[in-house]
Amino acid sequence: MTIIALGINHKTAPVELREKVAFSPEQISEALQQLSGHAHFNEAVIVSTCNRTEVYCSLAQQNSQTLLQWLSSFHGLDEHELSKNIYCHEGSDAINHLMRVACGLDSLVLGEPQILGQIKQAYNSAKTHNAVGVTFDRLFQKTFSVAKQVRTETNIGASAVSVAYAAVNLAKHIYGKLDKTNVLLIGAGETIELVAKHLYQNEPQNITVANRTLERARSLADQVSGDVIALAQLPERLHKADIVISSTASTLPIIGKGVVEQALKQRRYKPMLFIDIAVPRDIESQVGELDDAYLYSVDDLQTIVSENMSAREEAAEQAEVIITERTKEFLMWIRSLDSVDLIRHYRNDVQTIKSELVERAVSQLNTGKDAEKVILELANKLTNRLMHAPTRAIQDAAKKGEVAQLNQLKKMLGIDQE
């Protein structure tokens, strides 16, 4: 038996191709049914996200070409063209790859935790469709355990590595808990949307979104149970904010020193935190000269992100060591499975010999034959029958001069020669 991981991701293919290979929830259901009923595949799990699509299969024999043929056929794509952007891992490499993916080591953002939840969802879906057997059940449970160990024993997810996340972390560092803070977000683009999501998880007292287009502001505010104001209302509402985070596409500053001075006066000079992650800047640099206004720019955050990325890369090296060790452990378990059938077959053969000879001995005893002679005959015949195969193996190895084979047979038979 072998395990194969066939996939495509942000490193190997553009989004236009990744879209074509992605599986919708309905398609995953159909695909798992096809793979489960396929003659070559024993088990299957399909992981499909915006950045990657991966099919994990266990097969009786190595046959990655069959899996590629199935994938291209399922999506109606040219097999040759698809193969240019596909990667394939087999055996220990496939196991190692799965564990690396689950730990976020193969993600666009190093160490991101979302992929683990997506793999768990893929595994549960495969179980629901009876596409997971003993091997994959053990493999994926082991993978989840490894991901937890990496999170616990390294700092892979401890530091912010996006500007949006760093902005929220900076606010937390300064204020501690954010549950008593009022936050003003200026803009409604992708970066501010990410900031809003990170903020919402920290449960600030209030989030207000200010934007030139109120419709976009409302769409974002609805996601975080926030309020909406127009940009023109900033001068009259600024004093209510403890934290201001801005990221618009404006070519000129939106907040000047004078407006902030007025807001601080209305707040009785209670400090304000300004985080400007726009390029060009939304907040005049002179704001940082005010005693009770603390201004951080996108460059400040990029420095934090760069330092944190270095820390994550160091943690990733520690994670690789853990993953390598756990891959070896799983391979040992796989190999132990290969011995189970052999042991069962050998035991059945011995039991057959025993039953045959015991039945003959009992028959002889029933005819009145001397019991001692019957027992001796039984012992001799049982010994000869059990010794026949290893004796032949020893003789053959000796004739061929296979010293290593002879030593292996001695070890197997427990023969200790001085």
Swiss-Prot record:
Q: Which UniProt keywords apply?
A: NADP, Oxidoreductase, Porphyrin biosynthesis
Q: Which PROSITE patterns match?
A: GLUTR
Keyword field contains Zinc? no
One biological-process term from Gene Ontology? protoporphyrinogen IX biosynthetic process from glutamate
The cross-references to SUPFAM superfamilies, in alphabetical order and at most eight, read: Glutamyl tRNA-reductase catalytic, N-terminal domain (SSF69742), Glutamyl tRNA-reductase dimerization domain (SSF69075), NAD(P)-binding Rossmann-fold domains (SSF51735)
Q: Which GO terms describe its molecular function?
A: glutamyl-tRNA reductase activity; NADP binding
Q: Which reaction does it catalyse?
A: (S)-4-amino-5-oxopentanoate + tRNA(Glu) + NADP(+) = L-glutamyl-tRNA(Glu) + NADPH + H(+)
Which EC number(s) does UniProt give? 1.2.1.70
Q: Any other noteworthy remark?
A: During catalysis, the active site Cys acts as a nucleophile attacking the alpha-carbonyl group of tRNA-bound glutamate with the formation of a thioester intermediate between enzyme and glutamate, and the concomitant release of tRNA(Glu). The thioester intermediate is finally reduced by direct hydride transfer from NADPH, to form the product GSA.
Q: What does this protein do?
A: Catalyzes the NADPH-dependent reduction of glutamyl-tRNA(Glu) to glutamate 1-semialdehyde (GSA).
- Outline the subunit composition: Homodimer.
Record note on domains: Possesses an unusual extended V-shaped dimeric structure with each monomer consisting of three distinct domains arranged along a curved 'spinal' alpha-helix. The N-terminal catalytic domain specifically recognizes the glutamate moiety of the substrate. The second domain is the NADPH-binding domain, and the third C-terminal domain is responsible for dimerization.
Give the PANTHER family listed for this entry: GLUTAMYL-TRNA REDUCTASE
Protein name (database record)? Glutamyl-tRNA reductase
Question: Source species, please?
Answer: Pseudoalteromonas translucida (strain TAC 125)
